[in-house]
Amino acid sequence: VTRPVVDFPDEAMANGMTSTEQIIWAHRVDKGLSRGEFKPGATLRVYADLLPASDGTAPFSIHTFNQITGGNTIDPRQAAIANDHFVFTGKDEDEKQTSIGRAFAKIHSLGKPYYATPGDGIFHFYFPEQGLVLPGAFIPGAD
């Protein structure tokens, strides 16, 4: 797997940029983008270090992912799913919700720490505790 180059701006360019802007700049796909084109409201393609989802958001994310990529991952270590919302309820609709993430994890060989089973921990704590969230990383989320 070839990972994209993540280049943070030098001190001169970083001057006047927020920390968030520096992270987005570093993760942009189009390295030819000028500083003048990089501004609020611009549409950019970025490389994400991690694409986390909970059992609540995973079905929607997986559906969109499959539409865009045809179901092929660039790097399975970019995807992470935590089951912490719809577990232990005994409801069929909740089981259906979590089964989508389980099937995705199986197809793409996602295991711990990238796939958290019920009881492993709460989404927002689990991934950082597992060392998957690092300073300067670009990690989009639904909430």
Predicted regions and their residues:
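Fe-S-dependent hydro-lyases/dehydratases of central metabolism
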Residues: 1-142
